[in-house]
Amino acid sequence: MKAFSSYDEKPPAPPIRFSSSATRENQVVGLKPLPKEPEATKKKKTMPNPFMKKNKDKKEASEKPVISRPSNFEHTIHVGYDPKTGEFTGMPEAWARLLTDSQISKQEQQQNPQAVLDALKYYTQGESSGQKWLQYDMMFIDDAPSRTPSYGLKPQPYSTSSLPYHGNKIQDPRKMNPMTTSTSSAGYNSKQGVPPTTFSVNENRSSMPPSYAPPPVPHGETPADIVPPAIPDRPARTLSIYTKPKEEEEKIPDLSKGQFGVQARGQKAKKKMTDAEVLTKLRTIVSIGNPDRKYRKVDKIGSGASGSVYTAIEISTEAEVAIKQMNLKDQPKKELIINEILVMRENKHANIVNYLDSYLVCDELWVVMEYLAGGSLTDVVTECQMEDGIIAAVCREVLQALEFLHSRHVIHRDIKSDNILLGMDGSVKLTDFGFCAQLSPEQRKRTTMVGTPYWMAPEVVTRKQYGPKVDVWSLGIMAIEMVEGEPPYLNENPLRAIYLIATNGKPDFPGRDSMTLLFKDFVDSALEVQVENRWSASQLLTHPFLRCAKPLASLYYLIVAAKKSIAEASNS
């Protein structure tokens, strides 16, 4: 690669936003009220049975009573809405407090009371225990929490909004022999019933044409020279969430159908895997051997309550990788670990962060991924003004990943800038598959609410069945994010934001008037409220807006500019 000299003409600096859209201050997130203490109940005295034999009495007295778990229990909900008074009736006290603080006006409540109940149900069902395994507990030693790691790690000199899995030395999986994509290093075993996958979708589409050579790095600069210190993160409410499926919950009365005071019977939840079952399953996935003999750790780039992230070198190839070491005992959703590893291992693509290997070392799981130094798209979005050509290029790369996943009946369900990772060569890759869903022929739709609220499609927020097009909606919101620096409703109360998504559908935003007609049509095609009218990923790849895409190498200068802006803001 030719280095810049003093005689070379450097391109103009990328436009920087006058003020960063990243949140610089810690924001207080309201805590849910604690449940009331159960009232003490007096034990009922039983009359002795005079017909019982004494020896039988002694035997029964020595035995401890066996109490079975409750079955066929009922939870009664009586929530109604009185249009005359404009008030909800029978609403739990905790819900009433949330509604009072939500800034949802009385007029809005009257216009769509069902949307209010849906929003309340979603907000109260969100559980921190359902966060993805890539996200650690929010534990920071310094006063200013890290802005970039969405998994809550305390960053070291380098940080990203998600696990920084990238690398430029990994062979393009579309050029690999389909029968060798799942190698022994990835822990593949023919007895597992998960055969190697082929790549039949868009094999001739290149994510970076040969003419798009990576830009030269200025003389004397390396990616390590431009790594900034960490700055505060986005609000905690932008973290991904998980709520249990509808079939596991108590029903909410559908006010649109005149259902007031519905009695809901609790149904059996899906059986949760035990720790022993998780370990047994992981042993069929991971590689056997000592990872220290294959990889040499270089730098620790993050740490948290249950693990650490390192950059490392594969000894045999000298390729740079990322290794995440996790203590399985500290992972709240161990099943998601298995889900993510299996999905990434069996769905390799040039626009998806590659899973390379995994090992079980005592109680620790080591996951090896490819590593890219560019960080997440969030840094570029919040610090730089992106041209239409750059936005089109990013959207094209993400759509290629989505088209590939959807063709294999996989829904990502958490598309946002935090989960788009960049290489210094301009490569764009999708990561974080902790919430992805595999659809079977028998189950073409999902009802589980997952993802991040501000990027959620209306059918997800309203808890309807949904399919792959929820990813397309999230891509449309991400396109707005690249224009505005943040998604719509980010400054609204979270409960009100959920209500607005369910009620308004396609959001309005200030920068819309300055967009070109082609860009507007592209966003509108992705943000169709009616799912049948919303374009698919394959259809959007044919949209004329993508023809204005600039070379991916142009992203290099935006990445550098964003890092410098973050460093200056941190030092000021």
Swiss-Prot record:
Lineage: Eukaryota, Metazoa, Ecdysozoa, Nematoda, Chromadorea
Subunit structure, interactors included: Interacts with cdc-42 (GTP-bound form) and cedd-10 (GTP-bound form).
Residue ranges, annotated region (Linker): 81-294
Polar residues: bias regions: 178-195
Source organism of this protein record: Caenorhabditis elegans
GO biological process, one term: intracellular signal transduction
UniProt record similarity statement: Belongs to the protein kinase superfamily. STE Ser/Thr protein kinase family. STE20 subfamily.
Domain Protein kinase, chain residue ranges per copy: 295-546
Keyword Nucleotide-binding listed: yes
Gene coding for it: pak-1
Protein name as it appears in the record: Serine/threonine-protein kinase pak-1
Localization (cell): Cell membrane; Cytoplasm; Cell projection, Axon; Perikaryon
Catalyzed reaction equations: L-seryl-[protein] + ATP = O-phospho-L-seryl-[protein] + ADP + H(+); L-threonyl-[protein] + ATP = O-phospho-L-threonyl-[protein] + ADP + H(+)
Active site: 414
Gene Ontology MF terms: ATP binding; GTP binding; protein kinase activity; protein serine kinase activity; protein serine/threonine kinase activity
